[in-house]
Amino acid sequence: MFHMLTCFDLKPENTLEEFQQSLENYSSFMQGQGLGVGHSPIGLRQSDSILDTDEEREQKYFMLMHFRDRKQSDNAVAYIKSHEEPGKSLHLKAYSQTQNLIFISWEDID
């Protein structure tokens, strides 16, 4: 599987519940289009833990998006860049509620 980690903060005017709903709507749509296989629950960073050694980033939240493989991920990105509706609005709704985003991607080793 191929994965994308997103570390982010919410904009002050948005709630976690609003973002969770927007993310669920977007992710469900993308799955229905064959452009993803799901996402993780949203995590709350525990930066005061000894296990958290990342001193470069201060984002409060994180989540994973999962793809069958790199090709499906690339197809999802191409779809987003096409600005086709309703994906454009669903992506923008979720994306616009966040700030300070960092993305990291990887593929599982078999």
Provide a role label for each language-model segment.
Residues 2-9, 62:
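Active-site-flanking beta-strand signature of metal-NTP-handling nucleotidyl enzymes
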Residues 6, 16-27, 40:
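N-terminal first-folded block
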Residues 8-12, 67-68:
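Short, flexible beta-strand-to-coil junctions
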Residues 13-17, 47, 80:
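Acidic-and-aromatic substrate-binding clefts and catalytic sites of carbohydrate-active enzymes
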Residues 13-19, 71-75:
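Short, conserved charged micro-motifs
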Residues 25-37, 52-60, 64-103, 110:
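An amphipathic, aromatic/His-enriched active-site/gating alpha helix that lines ligand/cofactor pockets
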Residues 41-45, 104, 108:
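Acidic carboxylate-rich catalytic motifs and surrounding loops in phosphoryl-/glycosyl-chemistry enzymes
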Residues 44-52:
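Carbohydrate-binding/catalytic loop surfaces
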